[in-house]
Amino acid sequence: MTAKLNSVIINPSVAHTATVIFLHGLGDSGQGWSFMANTWSNFKHIKWIFPNAPSIPVTVNNGMKMPAWYDIYSFADMKREDENGILRSAGQLHELIDAELALGIPSDRILIGGFSQGCMVSLYAGLTYPKRLAGIMGHSGFLPLASKFPSALSRVAKEIPILLTYMTEDPIVPSVLSSASAKYLINNLQLKCLDRPFEGDAHSLSSESFMAMYKFTQTVIGSP
């Protein structure tokens, strides 16, 4: 059992029939993404969970502690990965999913996702979770620990819709990594992944990517 995550939770205003679990990026918090629930208030049946990453030493932050799902050794070489940290955080996300199942929410009514680091953890966790999820959505990320696939892929992963959005000139997570991951998911792993690049040079969520995520949420769990 891994350490339990502290989360910002926004409960539905009607009967709870679906859940979204969304992970923030490096140095952020669950509160920083809770605006999604307020902006998408028409999804009255959805419970929103925005977990807070633990504060850990981060190499690119001169070893100082900050909220992070795993260590980042270098922004210049993002393929050098903190495997233990990624696996630990993916396990914590699995436990959050398990907790929703225990409340009676079917796995195919649980949508997971995230931004940057949160996107990467969500991709790994979703593709390795043993039950079929409603979907996986992420912005400004790529598939971590890619060498573990396809062997790490769950037997139901090919049934899970995936949305990967990113900015074409992202200064932190190069779009070439996001694009390559999307192509790998589609062509090599034969997964149902939507590859959605948007013009822009910021490491942030654009209005276009936000709308794409809204439409994706509407498609996979929008109906009560």
From Swiss-Prot:
InterPro entries the record matches: AB_hydrolase_fold (IPR029058), LYPA1-2/EST-like (IPR050565), PLipase/COase/thioEstase (IPR003140)
Localization per record: Cytoplasm; Nucleus
EC numbers on record: 3.1.2.-, 3.1.2.22
Entry annotated with the keyword Oxidoreductase: no
One BP term from GO: fatty acid metabolic process
Top-level EC class as recorded in UniProt: hydrolase
Assigned keywords, A-Z: Cytoplasm, Fatty acid metabolism, Hydrolase, Lipid metabolism, Nucleus, Serine esterase
GO-annotated molecular function: carboxylic ester hydrolase activity; palmitoyl-(protein) hydrolase activity
Main subcellular location of this protein, as a coarse class: cytoplasm
Pfam families attached to this UniProt entry: Abhydrolase_2
Active site residues of this protein: 116 (charge relay system), 170 (charge relay system), 203 (charge relay system)
Any one of the GO CC terms: cytoplasm
Catalytic reaction list: S-hexadecanoyl-L-cysteinyl-[protein] + H2O = L-cysteinyl-[protein] + hexadecanoate + H(+)
Function summary: Hydrolyzes fatty acids from S-acylated cysteine residues in proteins with a strong preference for palmitoylated G-alpha proteins over other acyl substrates. Mediates the deacylation of G-alpha proteins such as GPA1 in vivo, but has weak or no activity toward palmitoylated Ras proteins. Has weak lysophospholipase activity in vitro; however such activity may not exist in vivo.
Family (UniProt): Belongs to the AB hydrolase superfamily. AB hydrolase 2 family.
The protein's name: Acyl-protein thioesterase 1
